[in-house]
Amino acid sequence: MDGPERDFNLKVVLISFKKCLTDKGEVLLDHYTASWKGLVRFLNSLGAVFSFISKDVVSKLQIMEHLRSGPQSEHYISLQSMVAYEVSNKLVDRDSRSRPRHPNSGCRTVLRLHRALHWLQLFLEGLRTSSEDARTSTLCSEAYNATLAAYHSWIVRQAVNVAFHALPPRKVFLEAMNMGSSEQAVEMLGEALPFIEQVYDISQKLYAEHSLLDLP
């Protein structure tokens, strides 16, 4: 990522998800990927503990940027237009028993980002609503087990949960968001997290309508 990781403001990153949505409730993919880049900077600022997520996210963002700059870029302006295009042209692999024909489809790629966004949303919400003496590692593990864990092998799940024990105390973690005191960070999360939640909910509904939530 360009520039030092500490030179970002998490509130700006979270509120940037507001730009993802049009008045019609469409999710604009350029803003979606830009917002995710900001989240990657946040994850990287916390050290190697989240590298297993941030590295995967970066690879998915590269796929989406390739699709946005490719010959069919007009179909990848919004999440809705992408889903309509790939589903109607059978560019989505639905059967896990068959050899993948479209491993880098936009639908599959965004689904991975969508799942990771849910984990981060739940984790940050847990930080916001928890008591001062809450263990960051426990909050992170609970969010992970409720979201991404279902898609990882047993070995990966064990390694991830061990890594979470290296997370700093809640107060230190909140102050790492560059929003002043931990109290100010909590207030900021209350203002900014609804934007992520709205993007997540719209994406979840769209994928459910097209039976895309369990793509292999």
UniProtKB/Swiss-Prot annotation:
Pfam families the UniProt entry points to: GLTP
Location within or outside the cell: Cytoplasm, Cytosol; Golgi apparatus, trans-Golgi network membrane; Cell membrane; Endosome membrane
Membrane topology term: Peripheral membrane protein
Catalysis performed (reactions): N-(hexadecanoyl)-sphing-4-enine-1-phosphate(in) = N-(hexadecanoyl)-sphing-4-enine-1-phosphate(out); N-(9Z-octadecenoyl)-sphing-4-enine-1-phosphate(in) = N-(9Z-octadecenoyl)-sphing-4-enine-1-phosphate(out)
GO CC annotations on file: cytosol; endosome membrane; Golgi apparatus; nuclear outer membrane; plasma membrane
InterPro entries linked: GLTP_sf, Glycolipid_transfer_prot_dom
UniProt keyword annotations, A-Z: Cell membrane, Cytoplasm, Endosome, Golgi apparatus, Lipid transport, Lipid-binding, Membrane, Nucleus, Transport
A GO term for molecular function: ceramide 1-phosphate transfer activity
GO BP of this protein: ceramide 1-phosphate transport; ceramide transport; intermembrane lipid transfer; negative regulation of autophagy; negative regulation of interleukin-1 beta production; negative regulation of NLRP3 inflammasome complex assembly
The family this protein is said to belong to: Belongs to the GLTP family.
Listed PANTHER family: CERAMIDE-1-PHOSPHATE TRANSFER PROTEIN, GLYCOLIPID TRANSFER PROTEIN-RELATED
UniProt name for this protein: Ceramide-1-phosphate transfer protein
Organism this protein belongs to: Rattus norvegicus
Lineage of the species this protein comes from: Eukaryota, Metazoa, Chordata, Craniata, Vertebrata
Gene: Cptp
